[in-house]
Swiss-Prot record:
Record's GO cellular component terms: plasma membrane
A Gene Ontology biological process term: L-aspartate transmembrane transport
InterPro entries: C4_dicarb_transport (IPR023954), Na-dicarboxylate_symporter (IPR001991), Na-dicarboxylate_symporter_CS (IPR018107), Na:dicarbo_symporter_sf (IPR036458)
Annotated protein name in UniProt: C4-dicarboxylate transport protein
PROSITE patterns registered for this protein in UniProt: NA_DICARBOXYL_SYMP_1, NA_DICARBOXYL_SYMP_2
Organism: Leptothrix cholodnii (strain ATCC 51168 / LMG 8142 / SP-6)
Gene3D superfamilies, alphabetized: Sodium:dicarboxylate symporter
Its membrane topology: Multi-pass membrane protein
Length: 447
């Protein structure tokens, strides 16, 4: 068993290293923009390393969690409650964005003529102009082949196969012990790889931040500062208001939870992608006391169905464009937009820029709001992406704990212990989390 060492010197903590990397990245991008822009491969490389490991981690976590369960009805109950939570909370996020943008009206008075906007930069996003139907979305969850799902890193497809594999392995009972043990030990190896990758997280955060500041510049924020400020403030209201109340109602503090995942939040701030910390979040949530099967089902599903920050962004950005271009939107039109976004927001993945792509597709399909207005926010979208990703990450973490409590899959004593006393060793060595949890992991029940 891996025994965590004592507290690390502050300069060796991931928290300190990522903060330092982000600050250096901002300075480099601001004072030497060409050099900062050239750092883009560092950020891209880090995210690719993480994406490389996501599919097998989801597979191992879900299979071991489901195959080790005694009552298979719990899987269906967990999935159903998770989807119910996702739908309710993401709808609240959409409504909050719609409410705030109508109250603050950040686009009123800009009087932008859509015909004068340069739409070359958004052509790639608006060309398709077609949304998936519900049937197409459901069919897209079924992979053409299992290899294709893993090769492309399609989370929902991998999740579907993993659930089916876990059910099938459970049916074998004791005969499946050898396969179960192999997959369970493989998960240890995969999280050890995550530990290696996280050693270069500061380099990835530095490269991504240097590129963002170097390419777009801090000056690009000034003309649209009101929209930026309104969006960031709305995300804070959602996190500490909506999610804070949900957390309090379920026996934990949103402040302590944010402190517990502070390293993950900093990595997301640097990379603008909540997907970059998915493996670490799964390990941290298991360590917090949520059952492995619940973490394996809720977290990957939440990355498609519970993107709270993206939901806030979509309604705010759409109405902002209408306000800025003097395009009137009646209450009926706004409610129609809301209804469409209830569907299209579920198709955004936790990767950089996905929110802008969904917004472009939605405006192209719905009509009423000039699609050319997307050019207004293209320059600041990367900066808004950071707030989206942070809100998405916190929202999915809270969702996992809440669903775990609803289903009885949360060890509240363990949760309180870790929220009150988080150690640097746990934060920096995700593979050690599995050593702590899996020593009591059950084998498939004999049938």
């Amino acid at each position: 068993m891996h025994t965590p060492s004592g507290p690390l010197p502050f300069y060796r903590s991931l928290y300190f290293q990522v903060i330092t990397a982000i600050v250096i990245g901002v300075l480099l991008g601001h004072y030497w923009p060409e050099t900062g822009t050239a750092m883009k491969p560092l950020g891209d490389g880090f995210i690719k390393l993480i994406k490389m490991i996501i599919a097998p981690i989801i597979f191992c976590t879900v299979v071991v969690g489901i195959a080790g369960m005694e009552d298979m009805k719990r899987v269906g109950k967990t999935g159903g409650l998770a989807l119910l939570y996702f739908e309710v909370v993401s709808t609240l996020a959409l409504l909050l964005g719609l409410l705030i943008v109508n109250l603050v009206q950040p686009g009123v008075g800009m009087h932008v003529d859509p015909a004068t906007l340069d739409t070359k930069g958004i052509a790639a996003y608006t060309a398709p102009g077609k949304m998936q139907t519900t049937t197409e979305f459901l069919l897209a969850v079924i992979p053409t082949t299992v290899v294709d799902a893993f090769a492309k890193g399609e989370m929902l497809q991998v999740l579907l196969f993993s659930v089916m594999f876990g059910f099938a392995l459970h049916q074998f009972g004791g005969r499946g012990t050898l396969v179960f043990d192999f997959i369970e030990k493989t998960s240890h190896v995969l999280f050890a790889i995550v530990g290696f990758i996280m050693k270069v997280a500061p380099i990835g955060a530095f490269g991504a931040m240097a590129f963002t500041i170097g390419k777009y510049g801090l000056g690009s924020l000034i003309p649209l500062a009101k929209l930026m400020g309104t969006f960031y403030a709305t995300c804070l209201v959602f996190i500490f208001g909506v999610l804070g109340l949900i957390a309090k109602a379920h026996g934990f503090s949103i402040w302590k939870f944010i402190k517990y995942i502070k390293e993950e939040l900093l990595i997301v701030l640097g990379t603008s992608s909540s997907e970059s910390v998915l493996p670490r979040m799964m390990a941290k949530l298991e360590n917090l006391g949520v059952r492995k099967s619940t973490v394996g089902l809720v977290v990957p599903t939440g990355y498609s169905f519970n993107l709270d920050g993206t939901s806030i962004y979509l309604t705010m950005a759409a109405v902002f464009i209408a306000q800025a271009t003097d395009t009137p939107m009646t209450l009926t039109q706004q409610l129609t937009l809301l209804a469409v976004l209830l569907l299209t927001s579920k198709g955004a993945a936790g990767v950089t820029g996905s929110g802008f792509i969904v917004l472009a597709a939605t405006l192209s399909a719905v009509g009423g709001v000039p699609v050319a207005g997307l050019a207004l926010i293209l320059g600041i979208d990367r900066f808004m992406s950071e707030a989206r990703a942070l809100t998405n990450l916190i929202g999915n973490g809270v969702a996992t704990v809440v669903v775990g409590k609803w289903t009885g899959d949360l060890d509240e004593k363990q949760m309180r212990y870790h929220l009150d006393r988080e150690t640097e060793a746990e934060a920096n060595e995700p593979e050690a989390v599995l050593d702590e949890i899996d020593q009591h992991m059950p084998v498939p029940a004999a049938r």
